[in-house]
């Protein structure tokens, strides 16, 4: 009888322990808050020189053995693979698996990898550690696992949905971006990944962020699909005051496009991961800011309260706009951030950095709060990031949007029908949208336009575009001082009804 009681008690204790134990963001937050109260310890590299000094071509030879993917022997649709350290990925991160009853460290082993022609001493790498990880999921076909998430380097992560290829990146946090003091790059130093059940359609990842002046706890819930959505919860703590905090940062690349054509002959009409910043302001206004590759660092700030969303988008999916069979810019996703709750007063900020080639990410966008708490106090931000190729879904259906911005030499048609340049710059902006397409072509659509002190609008005309079933704005402007930037805004209206988002363009200096 006593034995039966003991067994019953043991079973009850096991059930109670299993049901009550659960890993959560609060467990990570305790570590982050504890770190914030201590001095920063820079990560130490344990990387042998053969890996630290290798070239990119050599690093590419180190491949994960797909047959050894983590969870390969489980029926879960998600699998994990890991990145080896090498080049500037020279600091290990800890990766843990969270099960229903415990947390287990996923240990590095060189047996996970094939090294190609890279010569190395096996004894020097046996305890090396991983540089990061990737998540695989049968997103495009049921019998094939495709990579959908990559977490590698600082606090960067890339995500794609069905039929997409990697393009822009998201980050956990940005600090002092574009400030003279220099940017600080926080890094995820440890991850906890929940083991999914066979029927799970989402994967939960926790991360501990650390940097000289900030720490943070993050929870990412990845929901793969045609649009892959990542639900993000973050708890951030400052060690010291910072000049600027970038929340939900997105990083992309813009080299050239029709608003800023390539200075050299190139068979590709456009080359970019994103071509504009879209903002849904707290007051309901939609704003579209075409991207530039300026000759000097450019920072644009859009002040508002409680933003409803922002993102770096790739508008225009026709292959003919890119003509690149290797890099398939037409398949790269847009990323849209939707805040949860009220974020208060602050700005959506856009940073554009000069670059000579497509290998450098030169575009950054993020939310920066006006007020930051004292060091040690907790900041909470919740939001989703949608990675999509369906830009129509990322905009209000009753509001027309900018399909494309083209830049040209301004001219005037002479009596002999020959066009004569007149010293102006012309911008041709096509607007389209589901509701706009329903309007009769004789609708008296006009434009509300404005320009900053450094320019003058010489002419502004709007006409129906029968090809797009939208309206085309042509605006000729004269710049007063080419060494300064020139700001322009335009929106289409019908009497007192606003029909479109606001086109907000900055002509870079020395263009």
Curated annotation (Swiss-Prot):
Gene3D superfamilies reported for this sequence: 2.70.98.10, Immunoglobulins (2.60.40.10)
Gene Ontology CC terms, in alphabetical order: outer membrane-bounded periplasmic space
One of the GO BP terms on file: beta-glucan biosynthetic process
Protein location: Periplasm
Swiss-Prot/TrEMBL keywords: Periplasm, Signal
Pfam families: MdoG
Function as written in the Swiss-Prot or TrEMBL entry: Involved in the biosynthesis of osmoregulated periplasmic glucans (OPGs).
Family: Belongs to the OpgD/OpgG family.
Protein name, UniProt field: Glucans biosynthesis protein G
Phylogenetic placement of the source organism: Bacteria, Pseudomonadati, Pseudomonadota, Gammaproteobacteria, Enterobacterales
Record gene name: mdoG
């Amino acid at each position: 009888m006593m034995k039966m009681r003991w067994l019953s008690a043991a079973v009850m204790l096991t059930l109670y322990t299993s049901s009550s134990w659960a890993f959560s963001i609060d467990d990570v937050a305790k570590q982050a808050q504890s770190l914030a109260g201590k001095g920063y310890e820079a990560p130490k590299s344990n990387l042998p020189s053969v890996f630290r000094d290798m070239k990119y071509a050599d690093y590419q030879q180190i491949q994960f053995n797909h047959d050894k993917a983590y969870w390969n022997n489980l029926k879960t649709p998600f699998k994990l693979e890991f990145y080896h350290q090498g080049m500037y990925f020279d600091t290990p991160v800890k990766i843990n698996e969270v099960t229903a009853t415990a947390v287990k460290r996923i240990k590095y082993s060189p047996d996970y990898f094939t090294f190609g022609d890279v010569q190395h001493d096996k004894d020097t790498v046996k305890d090396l550690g991983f540089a990061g990880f990737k998540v695989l999921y049968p997103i495009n076909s049921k019998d094939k696992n495709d990579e959908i998430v990559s977490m590698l380097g600082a606090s960067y992560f890339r995500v794609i949905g069905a039929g997409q290829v990697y393009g822009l990146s998201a980050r956990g946090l940005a600090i002092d971006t574009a400030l003279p003091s220099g940017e600080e790059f926080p890094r995820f130093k440890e991850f906890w990944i929940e083991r999914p059940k066979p029927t799970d359609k989402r994967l939960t990842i926790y991360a501990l962020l650390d940097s000289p002046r900030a720490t943070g706890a993050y929870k990412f819930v990845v929901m793969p699909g045609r649009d892959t959505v990542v639900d993000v919860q973050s708890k951030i703590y400052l060690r010291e005051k910072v000049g600027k905090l970038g929340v939900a940062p997105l990083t992309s690349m813009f080299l050239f496009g029709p608003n800023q054509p390539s200075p050299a002959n190139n068979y590709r009409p456009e080359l970019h991961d994103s071509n504009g910043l879209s903002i849904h302001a707290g007051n309901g206004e939609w704003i579209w800011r075409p991207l530039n590759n300026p000759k000097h660092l450019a920072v644009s700030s859009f002040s508002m309260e409680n933003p409803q969303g922002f993102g770096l988008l790739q508008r225009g999916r026709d292959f003919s706009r890119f003509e690149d069979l290797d890099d398939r810019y037409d398949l790269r996703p847009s990323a849209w951030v939707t805040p949860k709750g009220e974020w208060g007063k602050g700005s959506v900020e856009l940073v554009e950095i000069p670059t000579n080639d497509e290998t450098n990410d030169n575009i950054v966008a993020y939310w920066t709060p006006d007020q930051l708490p004292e060091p040690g106090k907790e900041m909470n931000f919740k939001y989703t990031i949608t990675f999509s190729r369906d830009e129509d879904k990322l905009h209000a259906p009753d509001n027309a949007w900018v399909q494309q911005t083209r830049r040209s030499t301004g001219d005037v048609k002479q009596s002999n029908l020959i066009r004569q340049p007149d010293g102006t710059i012309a911008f041709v902006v096509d607007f389209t949208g589901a509701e706009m397409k329903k309007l009769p072509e004789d609708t008296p659509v006009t434009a509300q336009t404005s320009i900053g002190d450094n320019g003058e609008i010489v002419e502004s005309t709007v006409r129906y575009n029968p090809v797009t079933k939208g309206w085309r704005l042509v605006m000729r402007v004269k710049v007063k001082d080419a060494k300064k930037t020139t700001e322009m805004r335009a929106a289409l209206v019908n009497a007192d009804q606003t029909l479109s988002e606001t086109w907000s363009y900055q002509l870079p200096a020395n263009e």
